């Protein structure tokens, strides 16, 4: 059935969905999974294929009136946990945030690593997650608790040793199906794919990639931004004109043990460079929710709120939520 694909021919959406469902079943061999992931790595993924993969792995839950801010990782920038910090800031400003994330697979410091260190207890079901979201405006869903089929790919992904399509599929599989998404990608070729999935799925989304490779809005390079609603538009942000010069050592570290402290001090406003970086990446969350009309307004509102101490107090609340 899949011989033509293995020779490089693109698949339609339905065939791609069938293929991913088969690969996510115990009947599929690791050799076949490795072959498919390798072909996709070499020739790339079409929008129809990505849509089929998404539909195969995404549980058909009701859409949640909330926002997720997530990055693909893989940029090797070793920055603080900025999307998680931005999610906390946005929720402390009154927005409903359903954050989806994982631990680091690269030996650095992932979003779930940071949340664990705050004392946060991950919800184990969508029902529990929705209750948390209702109580506090914030919930963090730990990806392996909800993407159990991904465990079948673990051995193959480790053996292959390169990022596969699953690295880019996982971040958009939030089981609460938030209607609004801010998605950062380290691979610019996935921007149009994410925009296509968002448009075809009825999401509102902001897709972003920075020219220095960050899957965040970088303070050191221009960021390309795609805005998705009924239509897709594009813009660019020169973040340095908003933040001023930032010291890299205040927002990034090759030492995983230092990342949590830098992230926490940014949320508290003690690390001003970190706070500016977090405010910069909170801006698109405010924009997509109608709380800011542009990046400058969103950045300034988020930074003022961080420096007021609101996010630091809010973090104490969600860390104790059970």
Swiss-Prot record:
EC number: 2.4.2.18
Superkingdom of this protein's organism: Archaea
Binding site for anthranilate 1: 71, 102
Binding-site list for Mg(2+) 1: 83, 216
UniProt xrefs under SUPFAM superfamilies: Nucleoside phosphorylase/phosphoribosyltransferase catalytic domain, Nucleoside phosphorylase/phosphoribosyltransferase N-terminal domain
Annotated catalysed reactions: N-(5-phospho-beta-D-ribosyl)anthranilate + diphosphate = 5-phospho-alpha-D-ribose 1-diphosphate + anthranilate
Keywords, alphabetical: Amino-acid biosynthesis, Aromatic amino acid biosynthesis, Glycosyltransferase, Magnesium, Metal-binding, Transferase, Tryptophan biosynthesis
UniProt GO molecular function: anthranilate phosphoribosyltransferase activity; magnesium ion binding
Pfam families membership: Glycos_trans_3N (PF02885), Glycos_transf_3 (PF00591)
Annotated residues for binding of anthranilate 2: 157
GO cellular component: cytosol
Enzyme class name: transferase
Residues annotated for 5-phospho-alpha-D-ribose 1-diphosphate binding in this entry: 71, 74-75, 79, 81-84, 99-107, 111
Pathway: Amino-acid biosynthesis; L-tryptophan biosynthesis; L-tryptophan from chorismate: step 2/5
GO biological process: L-tryptophan biosynthetic process
Claim: S-adenosyl-L-methionine is one of the keywords in the record: no
Described purpose of this protein according to its UniProt entry: Catalyzes the transfer of the phosphoribosyl group of 5-phosphorylribose-1-pyrophosphate (PRPP) to anthranilate to yield N-(5'-phosphoribosyl)-anthranilate (PRA).
Complex and partners: Homodimer.
The protein's name in its UniProt record: Anthranilate phosphoribosyltransferase
Native organism: Thermoplasma acidophilum (strain ATCC 25905 / DSM 1728 / JCM 9062 / NBRC 15155 / AMRC-C165)
Organism classification: Archaea, Methanobacteriati, Thermoplasmatota, Thermoplasmata, Thermoplasmatales
Gene (name only): trpD
């Amino acid at each position: 059935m899949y011989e033509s694909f293995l020779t490089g021919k693109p698949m339609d959406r339905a065939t791609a969905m069938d293929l991913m469902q088969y690969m996510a079943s115990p009947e599929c061999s690791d050799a076949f999974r490795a072959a498919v992931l390798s072909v996709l790595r070499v020739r790339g993924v079409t929008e129809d294929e990505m849509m089929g993969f998404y539909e195969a792995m995404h549980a058909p839950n009701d859409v949640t009136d909330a926002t997720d801010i997530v990055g693909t990782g893989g940029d090797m920038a070793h920055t603080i946990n900025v999307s998680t910090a931005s999610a906390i800031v946005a929720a402390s400003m009154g927005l409903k945030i359903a954050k989806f994330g994982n631990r680091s697979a690269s030996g650095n410091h992932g979003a779930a690593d940071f949340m664990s260190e705050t004392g946060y207890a991950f919800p184990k079901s969508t029902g529990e997650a929705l209750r948390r979201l209702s109580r506090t405006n914030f919930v963090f869903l730990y990806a392996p608790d909800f993407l159990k089929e991904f465990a079948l790919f673990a051995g193959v992904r480790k053996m292959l040793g390169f990022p596969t399509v699953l690295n880019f599929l996982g971040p958009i599989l939030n089981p609460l199906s938030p209607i609004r998404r801010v998605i950062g990608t380290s691979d610019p070729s996935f921007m149009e794919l994410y925009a296509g999935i968002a448009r075809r799925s009825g999401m509102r989304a902001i897709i972003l990639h920075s020219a220095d490779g960050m899957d965040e809005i970088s303070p050191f390079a221009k960021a390309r931004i795609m805005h998705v609603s009924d239509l897709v538009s594009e813009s660019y942000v020169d973040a340095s004109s908003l933040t001023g010069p930032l010291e890299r050592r205040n927002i990034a570290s090759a030492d995983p043990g230092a990342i949590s402290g830098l992230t926490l001090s940014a949320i508290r406003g003690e690390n001003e460079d970190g706070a500016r970086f977090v405010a910069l990446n909170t801006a698109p969350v405010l924009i997509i929710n109608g709380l800011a009309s542009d990046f400058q307004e969103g950045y300034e509102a988020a930074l003022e709120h961080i420096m007021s101490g609101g996010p630091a107090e809010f973090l104490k609340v969600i860390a104790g939520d059970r």
